[in-house]
Amino acid sequence: MSGNNHPGDASAEIDVVLVTGLSGAGRGTAAKVLEDLGWYVADNLPPQLITWMVDFGLAAGSRITQLAVVMDVRSRGFTGDLDSVRRELATRNIIPRVVFMEASDDMLVRRYEQNRRSHPLQGEQTLAEGIAAERRMLAPVRATADLIIDTSALSVPGLRESIERAFGGDASATTSVTVESFGFKYGLPMDADIVMDVRFLPNPHWVDELRSLTGQHSAVRDYVLGQPGAAEFLRTYRRLLSLVVDGYRREGKRYMTVAIGCTGGKHRSVAIAEALMGLLQSDLQLSVRVLHRDLGRE
């Protein structure tokens, strides 16, 4: 958020984003995207220098209006450092947005093994133990983050899109909603705020002519949405989400991920997610996108 009432320049404003999260989850890539969007990016700036950098940005004549700081878990007392930075910035009427990057344990292990690097908290432990230790350490940070991005199944272009949607312009007037389909057989999405199970609908997998298709095909979509209760479910769920979104806005939260799950993430969840996105887009104060996490995995 922007800050003002700085002693040196009452009209000064600066937007601050703190990028943190699990090592190997894409903090560096997120920082590069923010830099491409015109943000001034400070990578691994010591916590005690963050407020100094903000003061520099608030000073008369400074051209820094958007500051992104990548915070590294390897700094001792990391969680306390983050809390301290937030308190200091609050004295300047600045409430930074915190972006938390994460990925599944399996994906993090794969990335470290591919790059032949050790985890910063690994020490004499195994790689998996180092990842688990970091996840425990950062749990309080994740719990208070403004935006959580799970990069497990996210390509670099997909990550870029997520960052651009959140920070590419003035998002203060809108709430960004991601409707994510998934398959329960592959696990719950780690970044979901709300999870809905649509396995109560008949499975197109058992219809021979629909089995090889997906929820993006009209035949499957018509089959799923034509089931008794499907239309009423969508209308009811749309009203429920309206209440939730209003609550998010009152609390100052601007990002929400709604996960829709079926068995394999191929038919029912995809069709329902697409239909729900269409209903939500009728709200002019919502920026909505759909993401099909497990489509193509079968």
From Swiss-Prot:
<feature type="binding site">
    <location>
        <begin position="72"/>
        <end position="75"/>
    </location>
    <ligand>
        <name>GTP</name>
    </ligand>
</feature>
<keyword id="KW-0342">GTP-binding</keyword>
<keyword id="KW-0067">ATP-binding</keyword>
<comment type="function">
    <text>Displays ATPase and GTPase activities.</text>
</comment>
<keyword id="KW-0547">Nucleotide-binding</keyword>
<dbReference type="Pfam" id="PF03668">
    <property type="entry name" value="RapZ-like_N"/>
</dbReference>
<dbReference type="InterPro" id="IPR053930">
    <property type="entry name" value="RapZ-like_N"/>
</dbReference>
<feature type="binding site">
    <location>
        <begin position="21"/>
        <end position="28"/>
    </location>
    <ligand>
        <name>ATP</name>
    </ligand>
</feature>
<dbReference type="InterPro" id="IPR053931">
    <property type="entry name" value="RapZ_C"/>
</dbReference>
<dbReference type="Pfam" id="PF22740">
    <property type="entry name" value="PapZ_C"/>
</dbReference>
<dbReference type="GO" id="GO:0005524">
    <property type="term" value="F:ATP binding"/>
</dbReference>
<comment type="similarity">
    <text>Belongs to the RapZ-like family.</text>
</comment>
<dbReference type="InterPro" id="IPR005337">
    <property type="entry name" value="RapZ-like"/>
</dbReference>
<dbReference type="GO" id="GO:0005525">
    <property type="term" value="F:GTP binding"/>
</dbReference>
<dbReference type="InterPro" id="IPR027417">
    <property type="entry name" value="P-loop_NTPase"/>
</dbReference>
<protein>
    <recommendedName>
        <fullName>Nucleotide-binding protein ML0563</fullName>
    </recommendedName>
</protein>
